[in-house]
């Protein structure tokens, strides 16, 4: 890895969201990883928790962020923290895609993005196994899911 990562460099992943792994765990001795992600209009990332902190930098568009029981909107240029082990969700509030950078500390969960991008659609067992390996727990029964969908038309 070079000291400069170009805008078109990184590992492109398939899946529902366009994800590019820009910096991997092995590049930083496990300190951090960096991904770039495009969130489609109206898309909601289900409330979940994980064992690392994630800093989100909004490059374009605007995202909604739920952290714990607080909701905030983050426009281009803003930063948001999704702390480890705290329930959180994100969604695109606009009619155009939102582009974000996520800094994962410590590193490791970039592998979850890589693993889940390779799963066949509907492979719930593979998805659950990857979540378990990487300490990620989705909460589809969270009352926040319904609230966010209704409030923001997601």
Question: How does the language model describe each region?
Answer:
Residues 1-32, 122-154:
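A short, N-terminal "cap"/entry segment at the start of jelly-roll beta-barrel domains
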Residues 19, 40-42, 83-86:
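Short acidic (Asp/Glu) patches
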Residues 21-23, 36-37, 55-56, 77-78, ...:
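Hydrophobic/aromatic beta-strand elements that line small-molecule binding cavities or substrate pockets
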Residues 28, 84-110:
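Ligand-binding loop in jelly-roll beta-barrel domains
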Residues 31, 49-50, 93-94:
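Short glycine/proline-enriched turns and hinge-like loops at secondary-structure junctions
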Residues 35-49:
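Conserved short histidine dyad/triad with adjacent acidic residue
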Residues 55, 62, 69-87:
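Short acidic-glycine-tyrosine-enriched beta hairpin
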Residues 99, 110-122:
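A hydrophobic, small-residue-rich beta->alpha segment in the mid-to-C-terminal subdomain
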């Amino acid at each position: 890895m070079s000291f400069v990562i170009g805008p078109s460099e990184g590992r492109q992943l398939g899946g529902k969201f366009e994800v590019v792994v820009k910096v991997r765990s092995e590049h930083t001795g496990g300190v951090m990883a960096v991904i770039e992600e495009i969130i489609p209009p109206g898309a909601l990332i289900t409330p979940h928790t994980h064992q690392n902190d994630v800093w989100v930098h909004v490059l374009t568009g605007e995202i909604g962020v739920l952290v714990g029981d607080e909701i905030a909107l983050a426009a281009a240029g803003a930063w948001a923290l999704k702390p480890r082990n705290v329930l959180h969700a994100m969604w695109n509030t606009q009619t155009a895609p939102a582009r974000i950078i996520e800094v994962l500390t410590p590193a490791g969960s970039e592998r979850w993005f890589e693993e889940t991008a390779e799963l066949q659609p509907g492979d719930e067992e593979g998805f659950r196994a990857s979540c378990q390996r990487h300490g990620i727990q989705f909460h589809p029964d969270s009352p926040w899911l319904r609230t966010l969908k209704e409030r923001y038309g997601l």
